[in-house]
Design a protein with these regions (language model features):
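Residues on the lipid-exposed face of transmembrane beta-strands in outer-membrane beta-barrel proteins
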Residues: 68-71, 82, 122-126, 136, ...
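Residues that define the transmembrane beta-barrel architecture of outer-membrane proteins
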Residues: 74-76, 116-120, 159-165, 181, ...
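Repeated loop/turn-to-beta-strand initiation elements of outer-membrane beta-barrel proteins
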Residues: 78, 131-134, 167, 176-180, ...
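Outer-membrane beta-barrel domain signature
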Residues: 57, 67-71, 109-115, 155-158, ...
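Outer-membrane beta-barrel biogenesis signature
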Residues: 21-101, 178, 184, 322-339
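Outer-membrane pore/translocation modules
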Residues: 139-247, 298-306
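Outer membrane beta-barrel transmembrane domains
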Residues: 93, 97-103, 252-374
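Transmembrane beta-barrel strands of outer-membrane/channel proteins
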Residues: 80-86, 136-140, 185-191, 235-241, ...
Length: 374
């Protein structure tokens, strides 16, 4: 985990230096040419819309250059959002080595071949002050896992339902005078609203198919944000720490996640992004007495942990960037409606993963998010 966090922070620092240098060169070239709007290369947006014209400083961070779900410097503002995630898992690993279904069936009478998970997440955020943001998020899961037994019979296991509610405060603990660098302290609690009792054919489905955890969780974290007129970068670390066991005598393993990213605004309405996303998750502590660990790898509590590093690539669309309710760009009903809306699409592919297997490996993930700040 330390290697992932260190790698993320190193990447963020490198991107910060490169991005700042590129932005300074663009501003210098613009000054030489005598351009009054101080427009950056590849973007149609002028500094006057997003920056303080008198002081030359950023009034607030451009939300179009932030990852999905981050909101800062907007006292009295609300944000609502929706995110769809589709994750595909195909094949199994033991450590970093592939293991075939036929090999797994020598250890267990049943083996998973592949799995898909769809998550629909709804989010609402409110900023009572410029430093404090409060948010609530709740997901809905649809999971489907294809299985085969030693006799060659194929069957499908399914698990659907509402997941655990997350309540998260976020506090701005540091920012530079020009507001180009910010440090946010994350906290929160996970409320066990998701079910751990889902059944199929009269039998309880496996741990990974249940939509909930059954336990209260702590959600600490730390986020760094950096931004210029056309570039942004950052890194964060978040953890899910389970408190105690649920009423089926187990608790899911703690999870630790870190990521680093860089974004570039190409036009006034389009930005691209890339980054690294690392995760470490632990094995299950305890065991559900209704799940036989000898039946399949997904019922063994000791075959659930692992770690993974993904590469991500994304696009962000902002139809009316930097309006924030002001004139002249928000002078009509249509532009007022579009102001604050944002659509993001991100794909992830694993670079490396090591699993306490046999365990299904991730093949790819796609995230589609919409948010509206008003």
């Amino acid at each position: 985990m330390k290697r992932i966090v260190t790698l993320s922070l190193m990447l963020a620092a490198t991107l910060s230096l490169k991005s700042a240098s590129a932005d300074e060169m663009a501003m210098s070239n613009s000054a030489v040419s005598g351009a009054s709007d101080t427009k950056q290369m590849g973007t149609a947006e002028s500094r006057s819309e997003c920056d303080d014209m008198n002081a030359g400083e950023m009034v607030m961070m451009n939300s179009c250059l932030m990852p999905f779900g981050i909101m800062t410097g907007e006292a009295g503002k609300w944000m609502v959002g929706y995110q769809f995630m589709h994750e595909k898992m195909d094949g199994s690993l033991v450590g970093t080595d592939d293991i075939s279904v036929s090999q797994i069936l020598k250890q267990f009478p049943n083996a998973p071949t592949d799995m898909t998970m769809d998550m629909h997440m709804w989010m609402i955020m409110y900023a009572p002050t410029a430093r404090l943001t409060l948010s609530a998020m709740i997901p809905y899961f649809r999971k489907e896992m294809n299985m085969v037994d030693v006799d060659g019979n194929h069957f499908v296991m399914r698990g659907n339902g509402i997941g655990d509610l997350e309540l998260r405060p976020e506090y701005l603990i540091f920012q530079t005078a020009d507001k180009r660098h910010q440090l946010l302290l994350n906290g929160g609690i996970g409320v066990p609203t998701g079910s751990i009792d889902e059944e199929m054919g009269g039998f309880r489905v496996d741990y990974c198919m249940q939509p909930g955890s059954g336990t209260v969780s702590l959600l600490p974290g730390l986020t760094y944000l950096g931004q210029t007129t056309t570039w942004s970068w950052g890194a964060d670390f978040k953890a899910t720490v389970r408190l105690g066991r649920n009423n089926h005598n187990y608790r899911l393993g703690n999870r630790y996640e870190s990521r680093a990213w860089v974004m570039r605004q190409l036009t006034s309405w389009l930005a691209i992004s890339t980054g690294l996303n690392g995760a470490v998750w632990e094995n299950i502590e305890g065991a559900d007495p209704d799940l036989d660990p000898m039946m399949e790898q997904t019922t063994d509590p000791n075959l659930q942990g692992g770690k993974r590093l993904d590469a991500s690539f994304g696009l962000t669309f902002c139809p009316m960037p930097c309006c924030h309710g002001g004139s002249p760009c928000c002078s009509t009903a249509v532009t007022k409606f579009l102001d604050g809306q944002q659509l993001s699409v991100e794909g992830r592919v694993p670079i490396i993963q090591s699993l306490d297997g046999p365990q299904l490996e991730n093949s790819w993930t796609i995230n589609i998010g919409w948010q509206w700040m008003f």
